[in-house]
Amino acid sequence: MQRSLKWFASATTLAMLFVLIGGALVTKTGSGMGCGRSWPLCNGQWVPDHITPELIIELSHRLVSGLAGIMVLILSIWAWRAIGHVQETKFLAVISFVFLVLQGLIGAAAVVWGQSDFVLALHFGISLISFAAVLLLTLLIFEIDKTFSAASLSLDGKMRFHIYGITIYSYIVVYTGALVRHTNASLACPSWPLCAKTRLLPVQFHEWVQMGHRLAAAVIIIWIAAAAIHAVRHYRRQPVIYYGWLIALLLVLAQMTTGALVVFTQLNLYIALAHAFFISCLFGVLSYLLLLALRTRRAPVKAADHSAGEAAPATLK
């Protein structure tokens, strides 16, 4: 694989991560209207004459997103030509660019015409899909699957259920988290993990949004912990699965910690951005596990020595 392609893929992945964090920064700082209802111009000007912090944040996010879009398009074409023989390459190349354009259109529509909070909450999730596709393309370019002998993987039904279920469910958790941001419900509940020390249930809309996200997050933490335990017990000799779930567990615990700290620190900006960073990384890990699971589903089932003394996947319960 050409070294230049690897470098460019890495840079594009990093650029997409900046798009995600930048979008979270725009929302957290209330900078979405920093350029007024003007797009792609800023307040109807190419070079704004009245500079505010909100304008700088919004304009920077637009510039980074535009640069990332160009980089993703170049990477998609380059990867298509260089590793198009790898089955997932063309699909990921298309998804990465299409979803990045889609999130840009939603962002532009929100500025020009305005959108409901429920529609705006999709903005981060759509960007996340594009980021995951770029990340997977990068991993294919680096041939990570060969490094971990991913071609010889064999997964039992329970592990496949965990991978498919958690990956899909994580997107729901992401949406609820984005909804918390867009409805300004981050500090609706002054306590943690309960909404308030004096009562158990929320009493108004913003509290329900906040507690709905906390409940969704609690479920995914428990579910990922269960998947990690299953991986530790049965997949010690398949490191990509074993370490993949351990990393996912660490990331979701970091996500939980930063989520709690957002409340305790009264919405500290750096902690809030770390919260967005950890969920982006977690979704990337889950997406790679999903790619591997889809590969093994297509491939003939092979007897796998998951761990010393364990039976093949077909006999696991």
From Swiss-Prot:
It is an enzyme of class 1 (oxidoreductase). GO terms for molecular function: metal ion binding; oxidoreductase activity, acting on NAD(P)H, heme protein as acceptor. It is a multi-pass membrane protein. The active site is at E58. Disulfide bonds join C35-C42, C189-C195. Residues 1-6, 84-90, 143-159, 233-243, 292-317 are cytoplasmic. It catalyses: Fe(II)-heme o + 2 A + H2O = Fe(II)-heme a + 2 AH2. Pathway: Porphyrin-containing compound metabolism; heme A biosynthesis; heme A from heme O: step 1/1. Its cofactor is heme b. The chain crosses the membrane at residues 7-27, 63-83, 91-111, 122-142, 160-180, 212-232, 244-264, 271-291. This is Heme A synthase. It comes from Geobacillus kaustophilus (strain HTA426). The gene is ctaA.
